Amino acid sequence: MTKTVLLIGGDGFIGTHLKQKLTDQGHSVNVIDKKSNRDINNEYSFITDINFSHVVFLAAEANLRAVKQNPKEAIKTMTSGLMNSLINYPQAHFTYISSSMVYGNWDSDSVHEYSAKAPIDLYGQLKLAGEGIVRELHDHWTIIRPTAVYGSNDDPRRVMPFFIERARNNETLTVKGHSN
């Protein structure tokens, strides 16, 4: 069965890969992204003439340094942009791409859906708040909490591409954190 999918924030790392996969499977895919002059903080940016079966919300500032440098923009996109998206597509199944950052620094070898949420930075706090907004404002939803994602065409400023490039160049890797 062909789906009509809207990727909000679909020009980012995960979105470009997801768009390719969905298109390869024969689904109809549309994208809203600030990179293509459609800002979800502007109510006129939404596509309203298509009845989407699925909406995937990927919009976020994935670079933690950028979140710290411009928290106002991150907050706007990850809260009011999210609410605009939920309000504009009440009929669609809504998938919210959250983050494992909602758990903060966990002490066990693994976490699960019901593990304690204790975000340690603004990004994790905004993702956790987004989950609550989705649960409150939409009837049909899925929340996904990926861990560190990386792969081809990743932003070289992110940690995994940085580590991979250092390793390829046989350079020292410095990892800061707790040693327990």
Regions from the language model: what does each represent?
Residues 5-25:
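N-terminal Rossmann NAD(P)H-binding glycine-rich loop of SDR-like oxidoreductase domains
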Residues 29-47:
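Adenosine-cofactor binding site in Rossmann-like domains, unifying the SAM/SAH pocket
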Residues 55, 69-94:
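NAD(P)-cofactor binding segment of oxidoreductase domains
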Residues 56-62, 98-100:
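Conserved NAD(P)H cofactor-binding loop of Rossmann-fold oxidoreductase domains
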Residues 64-81, 111-119:
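Short alpha-helical oligomerization interface
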Residues 83-122:
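Conserved Rossmann-fold NAD(P)-dependent oxidoreductase catalytic core, especially the SDR/UDP-sugar
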Residues 126:
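Active-site helix of classical SDR
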Residues 132-180:
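NAD(P)-dependent short-chain dehydrogenase/reductase
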